[in-house]
Amino acid sequence: MGVFRFISISLAAVSAANAAQILSMPHAQTVPNSYIVMMKDDTSDDDFNHHQSWLQSTHTHNITRRATIQNAGMRHKYNFSKMKGYSGIFDEETIKDIAKDPKVMFVEPDTIISVHGKVEQSNVPSWGLARISNPQPGAGSYIYDSSAGEGITVYSVDTGVDVNHEDFEGRAIWGSNQVNDGDDRDGSGHGTHTSGTMVGKEFGIAKKAKLVAVKVLGNDGSGPTSGIVAGINWSVEHARQNGGTKKAVMNMSLGGSSSSALNRAAAQAVEQGMFLSVAAGNDNQDAQSSSPASEPSVCTVGSSAEDDSRSSFSNWGPAIDLFAPGSNIISARPGGGSQSMSGTSMAAPHVAGLAAYLMALEGISGGAVCDRLKELGTSSITDAGPGTPTNVLINNGGAKGGKPNPNPAPSPSPSPSQPSEPQQPTPSQPGQPGEPFPGEPQQPTPSQPGQPGEPFPGEPFPGEPFPGEPFPGESFPGESFPGESAPAPAPMPPSPQHPHTPYPGGDNFDFDGLWKKYFGGEHWRKMFSSFWN
């Protein structure tokens, strides 16, 4: 009995000494009792399964004793190739128990992430497309190679997308809803706008790329970090099973307080071959203080205005990789037609679209894409901001007279019905959320969301000529974004709430394995050398 007591006391002392850090987020808006748990890099699948089984038992025991939290339990499970973790609603005692597991790297409070854009007036001139294919501002045409991103898939990790919008021509599908609100549509308009800039026929850069909508933010433009990490994980797995991560681009026009969990998830996506374009933020401050913009491996994008100055709202600093048009950008809106929005949210999809364009044209992927964008860009930005290491504005190569433009497909010549610059589309009947397109039986619907491994809809798009008539002035009621005002949103029908389902549990920890890890000399070396890796 004495020996057992000694062992128990020793284990408790070692566990307390080596407990994972429970991070503090004093300046962030946190989700009550919601946490993200990240495991150490060397955690095996068996270790992770044992931890989940133990967690189920421990959590059930704690809740049975106290029963102070509603809807508690695991929400999301993350399983990248080199990063495992989960999120959920837990009481304080359960979180302390979780932190004692030597396989846990850190525990982070779940915080609120928001879009980086705002709705402004309609019918301003469209200039972003022309700017990225010409050496000087003020050009009137967008010149591009006819490959136009064909064979590349773009993941819109955002508020959802109106996949039925005419500008997507059947190349957009609904992928996943990590908000779990039962509302498979874009009730904000933000995700549809950013997607139009990336792949739209009229407004887009990569006009032949495919698009997958991954909803991680609600109709108010905000959502928890845990759901965004889940959206990244889903996108990586879907890309792996549908053409490969090296033919995939992810756009994240969102951000919030610095989050180790979100940065690690973004880094994992890049490590597995995806290109990530991330908005720098709209606070006119150092982007290093926000996530995922502060993650070094992503391509962090600041916003430029029509005169090549840094947009007054754009964040700056060492995290910035590139600038792209972000002020007064016209793109698609849910239900048909278009609207104008400003923000680094509008700049990031210019980079994502151009990345897809270059990946198709030059066969590059991953980190090489951001480097190539820097090579092709022009040193045009004035007042890039304190500590910003670059003043490069993106360009598709037309500004330097070489690649990528071996077989240009110029915008049509001006005529009374076919203007040379991209114009707003003629109004049409609003698409119904989730309604399948003709000839595309594989497209998921709200009641049948796409799953990783599901094939894309048919390759060719209809190719019908798009009317060149300018869209008459129409004011679109937009969403209100943090720190900014906008007209009241259009009324939306209520949607039911669907709570997350906890993952089931199983066996307890292996005591012999724990003993070896606690008292084996190799444990100490590994713990201190890998804690922050």
Curated annotation (Swiss-Prot):
Residues 1-19 form the signal peptide. InterPro entries: PCSK9_ProteinaseK-like, Peptidase_S8/S53_dom, Peptidase_S8/S53_dom_sf, Peptidase_S8_Ser-AS, Peptidase_S8_subtilisin-like, Peptidase_S8_subtilisin-rel, S8pro/Inhibitor_I9, S8pro/Inhibitor_I9_sf. Its EC number is 3.4.21.-. It comes from the Eukaryota. Its main location: secreted. Induction: Expression is up-regulated during infection. The keyword Signal applies. One of its GO terms (cellular component) is extracellular region. Residues 471-487 have a biased composition (Low complexity). Residues 20-116 form a propeptide. It is found in: Secreted. The active site is at D158 (charge relay system), H190 (charge relay system), S345 (charge relay system). One of its GO terms (biological process) is proteolysis. Residues 282-294, 378-394 have a biased composition (Polar residues). Residues 34-115 form the Inhibitor I9 domain. Keywords: Glycoprotein, Hydrolase, Protease, Secreted, Serine protease, Signal, Virulence, Zymogen. Glycans are attached at N233, N251. GO terms for molecular function: serine-type endopeptidase activity. Residues 126-400 form the Peptidase S8 domain. CDD domains: Peptidases_S8_PCSK9_ProteinaseK_like. Residues 405-470, 488-502 have a biased composition (Pro residues). PANTHER family: ALKALINE PROTEASE 1-RELATED (PTHR43806:SF58), PEPTIDASE S8 (PTHR43806). This is Subtilisin-like protease 1.
